[in-house]
């Protein structure tokens, strides 16, 4: 088994790590994210992303105590509110209309844990400015986006068709897609997972 375990089933996180040449195994956590969010509703969305990442990493690291485990999570904040992934595609229209012409935050949290204890943590926030898109574009997007509508909290995949929603962004590409890669690679070098 690889020295690193990814405690996530996220396809974009798996692809990003693999493309960067990092060897890892995937063991998604079974953490109840909704229960944690409800219990910690007083925390801001950035702190919730880190808390969820820590819970995932620590939970999986108890099962695989000899391995370094990476937990990751991302939250979205619009108008000061924490938003969740949509449970069904037909809710995407209203979500995207609520985002039209506005800025929102994506907060990414990463935690490396071993033996049930967090050893390293990172929080990064990005600002994304949704353009004032037309209803015609919205119809096209909803018809074309497919699983993007429910796979991510914003009803978009920034690395795919969702990029057309934005005027500009302030933040690192990898942070926007949910895995701030460069600081993570520095930490993995420090822990001896990849070559320094």
Predicted regions and their residues:
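N-terminal polybasic phosphate/anion-binding patch
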Residues: 1-68, 81, 136, 143, ...
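Residue-level signal for inorganic ion chemistry
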Residues: 17, 53, 73, 92, ...
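Mobile beta-alpha loop/short-helix "lid" or hinge segments that flank ligand
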Residues: 22-34, 109-117, 151-163
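Glycine-rich phosphate-binding loop
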Residues: 68-74
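Active-site-adjacent loop/tail segments of enzyme domains
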Residues: 74-104, 130
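Short beta-strand-to-turn element immediately C-terminal to the catalytic PLP-Schiff-base lysine
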Residues: 77, 111-114, 131, 168
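Anionic-ligand binding region
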Residues: 97, 109-113, 117-121, 125-126
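Active-site oxyanion/phosphate-handling segment shared across diverse enzymes
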Residues: 121-195
């Amino acid at each position: 088994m690889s020295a690193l375990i990814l405690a996530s089933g996220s396809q974009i996180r798996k692809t990003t790590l693999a493309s960067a040449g990092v060897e890892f195994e995937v063991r998604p956590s079974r953490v109840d994210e909704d229960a944690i969010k409800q219990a910690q509703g007083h925390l801001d969305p950035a702190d919730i992303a880190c808390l969820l990442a820590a819970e995932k990493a620590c939970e999986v690291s108890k099962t695989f105590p000899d391995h370094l485990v990476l937990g990751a999570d991302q939250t979205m904040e619009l108008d000061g509110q924490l938003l969740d992934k949509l449970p069904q595609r037909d809710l995407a229209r209203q979500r995207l209309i609520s985002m039209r012409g506005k800025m929102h935050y994506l907060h990414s949290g990463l935690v490396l844990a071993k033996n049930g204890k967090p050893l390293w943590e990172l929080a990064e926030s990005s600002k994304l400015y949704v353009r004032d898109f037309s209803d015609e574009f919205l119809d096209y997007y909803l018809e074309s986006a497919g699983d993007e509508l429910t796979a991510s909290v914003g009803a978009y995949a920034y690395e795919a068709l969702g990029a057309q929603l934005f005027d500009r962004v302030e933040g690192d590409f990898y942070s926007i897609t949910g895995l701030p890669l460069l600081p993570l690679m520095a930490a993995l070098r420090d822990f001896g997972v990849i070559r320094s």
